[in-house]
Amino acid sequence: MVPFFVQIKCKLGQSYAVANALAEAEIASEIYSTAGDYDLLVKFYVDNDTDIGHFINEKVQVLPGIQDTHTIITFKAFGAR
């Protein structure tokens, strides 16, 4: 499995609706509300052969209330168990 993170900027007043939609879709491992330029930080895992760009385009960016996304590809988790 390949982990990656997506920062999500929501339309005004839509952060909780977007977070709930992600949770209901059962595609995210973890969902956090954040302060700063983005409203949510979401951790995903996909199979090694999954096209991450296509996954984000087809499963994440189509959710109502999302204004912008920023994807973070990770390499190694330190201290992971």
Question: Which residue ranges define each predicted feature?
Answer:
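A compositional/biophysical signature of low hydrophobicity enriched in polar/charged and small residues
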Residues: 1-81
